[in-house]
């Protein structure tokens, strides 16, 4: 009997403390855009309004939704896609055991019950990409949905997509995804990498990581599985993912040739692209910029080629002494992408893997090629974002952003960090968040998270949480620095709650309410401490905010301005000091 993955096998949590799922009605019937509404308590009887924030958690935090992983989550986009009249259902390619990296299918593999569904593709001669619609002046439902999430006009969304400054990754075979946008004129987004390896993890664990990451705020997921059951794992993830899903197709193609890079062929890779597009992958990382002539340049590096995809293609190029087949077949790849609206994430296969290699000739040579490929993809109206480094010290970060905008004509930048130092294994979520905040401020559209396990091992769900929260901090800091019109509202609300000692509101308004409450309660667990006008850091007598309240109250009682109150209060304290003998505390 075939196994299954059920909600009982993974940890699913309701909405974050003090929050509830709300929906904003869109311009078309049935369109409901999710938000998370954070309640606030009153201040001396005066109401504090609830704060609405961007929500990526999908239906899992809706108390009215019953989680049934084997059925997948709702498909809000399905009717939008069909009513356009430019797609057709077809039989699709046959799923083979080799897709899961085995010769014979295992009866113990939990097959998704609806794997026999018919995929969609563009009708003959049609182009179904969001960029194609946008360039033809058409505002699609996905663009209207995104406009509500971002608090902007739908026409602005259309224009940003049409001009290539933003992408809306939305494969027509992933109708479960809630539309989102990646571009420097919108909220900075965060991607979370998940996926098994040859030595670790199960399908249930990877589905759990996906739900866990989106609960904490991941805007997209990349399934980087390199072990067994790659196809089946991806099917379970996509059918239950409320956010876009990306992959690196060369990983699965390599499994199909038993892990031998030189045995890769264009035909195997092409088959893998179609397989994943039919499943609903929203964006592909494709290392088409790793050219044969660039590989020798990496020989003088400290850490050589550190990208898995980049090293696979470099090995193939050197063995055959031929140009990268991803580059030579790029136009054919574009033809596949536009049939399903899969977006390009042009991979940085020659990114620096150490501070010593940052901004070197190999890295920027590849970037020049990615700029060339961007123009080709745009000729086909295929959406493109550009992947970036890597390991870069702080003083070299801005150059990366400036070069990408210039060379790649403003296409969205998607960076891994960058890590700003190499000396902190176990803390690389911090070393990279420093760089991520900076490059986000300079214009990067999406940040790929780094977990504490980077360079050390496969992250578990707790590492995923740590990585997502760390990168949400970096992304939000970048939004503030860029002057995003709504970014400061949550900061202002939390600051007000902090000054008014509304402890629960402080917890609830934070990115990780559970962690904030846990740390507070380690020293002040009593319920009364939730209304106390101090915490354990300073205690009741030395709380700066309590002293500020006292000064304001003194000013009010004595009809003084705050500065006058401080001056008068200081004089009174000086007089009191002298009258008591001028003795210091011992």
Curated annotation (Swiss-Prot):
It comes from the Bacteria. One of its GO terms (molecular function) is carbon-carbon lyase activity. Zn(2+) binds at residues 391, 455. GO terms for biological process: thiamine biosynthetic process; thiamine diphosphate biosynthetic process. Binds 1 [4Fe-4S] cluster per subunit. The cluster is coordinated with 3 cysteines and an exchangeable S-adenosyl-L-methionine. The gene is thiC. InterPro entries: ThiC, ThiC-associated_dom, ThiC/Bza_core_dom, ThiC/BzaA/B. It catalyses: 5-amino-1-(5-phospho-beta-D-ribosyl)imidazole + S-adenosyl-L-methionine = 4-amino-2-methyl-5-(phosphooxymethyl)pyrimidine + CO + 5'-deoxyadenosine + formate + L-methionine + 3 H(+). Catalyzes the synthesis of the hydroxymethylpyrimidine phosphate (HMP-P) moiety of thiamine from aminoimidazole ribotide (AIR) in a radical S-adenosyl-L-methionine (SAM)-dependent reaction. The keyword 4Fe-4S applies. The keyword Transferase does not apply. GO terms for cellular component: cytosol. Its EC number is 4.1.99.17. It comes from Bacillus anthracis. Belongs to the ThiC family. Residues 1-58 are annotated as: Disordered. This is Phosphomethylpyrimidine synthase. Pathway: Cofactor biosynthesis; thiamine diphosphate biosynthesis. Keywords: 4Fe-4S, Iron, Iron-sulfur, Lyase, Metal-binding, S-adenosyl-L-methionine, Thiamine biosynthesis, Zinc. Gene3D superfamilies: 6.10.250.620, Radical SAM ThiC family, central domain.
């Amino acid at each position: 009997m075939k196994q299954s993955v059920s909600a009982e096998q993974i940890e699913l949590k309701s909405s974050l403390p003090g929050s509830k799922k709300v929906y904003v009605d869109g311009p078309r019937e049935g369109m409901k855009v999710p938000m998370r509404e954070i309640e606030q308590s009153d201040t001396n009887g005066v109401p504090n309004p609830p704060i609405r924030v961007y929500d990526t958690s999908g239906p899992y935090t809706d108390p009215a939704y019953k989680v049934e992983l084997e059925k997948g989550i709702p498909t809000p986009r399905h009717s939008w896609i069909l009513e356009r009249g430019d797609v057709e259902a077809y039989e699709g390619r046959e799923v083979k055991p080799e897709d899961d990296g085995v010769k014979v299918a295992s009866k113990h593999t939990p097959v998704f019950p609806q794997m026999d569904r018919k995929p969609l593709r563009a009708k003959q001669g049609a182009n179904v990409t969001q960029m194609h619609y946008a360039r033809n002046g058409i505002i699609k439902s996905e663009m209207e949905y995104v406009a509500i999430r971002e608090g902007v006009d739908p026409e602005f969304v259309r224009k940003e997509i049409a001009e290539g400054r933003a992408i809306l990754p939305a494969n027509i075979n992933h109708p479960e995804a809630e539309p989102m946008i990646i571009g420097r004129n919108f909220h900075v987004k965060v991607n979370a990498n998940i996926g098994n390896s040859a030595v670790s993890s199960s399908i249930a664990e990877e589905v759990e990581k996906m739900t866990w990451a989106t609960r904490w705020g991941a805007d997209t997921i990349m399934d980087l599985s390199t072990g067994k059951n790659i196809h089946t794992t991806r099917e379970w993830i996509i059918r239950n993912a409320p956010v876009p899903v990306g992959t690196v197709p060369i990983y699965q193609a390599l499994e199909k040739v038993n892990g031998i890079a030189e045995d890769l062929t264009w035909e195997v890779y092409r088959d893998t692209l179609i397989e994943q597009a039919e499943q609903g992958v929203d964006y592909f990382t494709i290392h088409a910029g790793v050219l044969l002539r660039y590989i020798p340049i990496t020989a003088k590096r400290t850490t050589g080629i550190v990208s898995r995809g980049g090293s696979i293609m470099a090995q193939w190029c050197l063995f055959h002494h031929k140009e990268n087949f991803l580059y030579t077949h790029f136009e054919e790849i574009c033809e596949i992408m536009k049939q399903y609206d899969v977006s390009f994430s042009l991979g940085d296969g020659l990114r620096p893997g150490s501070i010593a290699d940052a901004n070197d000739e190999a890295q920027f040579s590849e970037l020049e090629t990615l700029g060339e490929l961007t123009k080709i993809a745009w000729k086909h109206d295929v959406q493109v974002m550009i992947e970036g480094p890597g390991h870069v010290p702080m003083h070299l970060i801005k150059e990366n952003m400036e070069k990408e905008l210039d060379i790649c004509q403003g296409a969205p930048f998607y960076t891994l960090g960058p890590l700003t130092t190499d000396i902190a294994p176990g803390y690389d979520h911090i070393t990279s968040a420093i760089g991520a905040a900076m490059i986000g401020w300079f214009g990067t559209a999406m940040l790929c998270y780094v977990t504490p396990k980077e360079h050390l091992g496969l992250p578990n769900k707790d590492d995923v949480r740590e990585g997502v929260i760390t990168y949400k901090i970096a992304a939000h800091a970048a939004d503030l620095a860029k002057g995003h019109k709504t970014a400061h509202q949550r900061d202002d609300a939390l600051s007000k709650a902090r000054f008014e000692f509304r402890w629960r509101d402080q917890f609830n308004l934070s990115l990780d309410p559970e962690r904030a409450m846990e740390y507070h309660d380690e020293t002040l667990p009593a319920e009364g401490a939730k209304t106390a006008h101090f915490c354990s850091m300073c205690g009741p007598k030395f709380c700066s905010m309590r002293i500020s309240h006292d000064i304001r109250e003194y000013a009010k009682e004595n009809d003084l301005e705050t500065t006058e109150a401080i001056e008068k209060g200081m004089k009174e304290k000086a007089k009191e000091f002298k009258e008591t003998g001028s003795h210091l505390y011992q």
